[in-house]
């Protein structure tokens, strides 16, 4: 039996905005392309918002890293990720695309949080490095993450109704992220 058997009933799935968007990395001369659907299949249904955050951060960072890489290619196994965001959806997306988790190049560092941005935005920071290039993706303050979502995720002893509502909030956040270009979700530093 799955340890997740007690999760709430999931809301009806809605179409994913821009399902044709892809992330491209390279491994030993072979081009690898991933869609959001690929990332969700790897992660499972639990945290579509976290998957969308990582997908957008990668979509923002990879072109910048490619511009500073030899041949314009980013080798997936050369990417290091540092973030204060510990969510499993983001972690699994970075693992699928970069293999950074199993190869110890994925680091969750709470001290990277931008606490001056407030509780809602503080942890949405992703630093990606390859070679001498580093890109830091910082979530735009544009209503992408609802305060209600942060408050409800942090609430202990959620009721069944609150858990069901949290599932809806996750899908709404996923859609707010994916209906925008990654540059409209994350700024780069």
Regions found by a protein language model. Give the residues of each.
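Non-transmembrane, aqueous-exposed alpha-helical and coiled segments at domain scale
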Residues: 2-47, 51-189
């Amino acid at each position: 039996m799955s340890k997740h058997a007690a999760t709430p009933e999931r809301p009806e799935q809605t179409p994913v905005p821009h399902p044709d968007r892809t992330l491209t990395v390279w491994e030993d001369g072979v081009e690898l392309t991933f869609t959001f659907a690929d990332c969700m299949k790897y992660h499972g249904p639990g945290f579509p918002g976290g998957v969308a955050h990582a997908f957008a951060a990668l979509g923002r960072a990879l072109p910048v890293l490619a511009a500073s890489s030899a041949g314009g290619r980013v080798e997936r196994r050369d990417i290091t990720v540092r973030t204060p965001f510990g969510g499993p959806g983001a972690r699994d997306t970075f693992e699928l695309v970069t293999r950074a988790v199993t190869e110890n190049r994925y680091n969750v560092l709470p001290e990277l949080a931008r606490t001056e941005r407030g509780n809602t935005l503080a942890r949405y920071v992703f630093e990606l490095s390859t070679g001498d290039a580093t890109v830091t993706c910082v979530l735009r303050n544009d209503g992408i993450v609802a305060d209600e979502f942060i408050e409800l995720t942090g609430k202990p002893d959620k009721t069944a109704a609150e858990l069901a509502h949290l599932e809806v909030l996750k899908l709404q956040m996923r859609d707010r992220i994916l209906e925008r270009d990654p540059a409209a979700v994350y700024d780069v530093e």
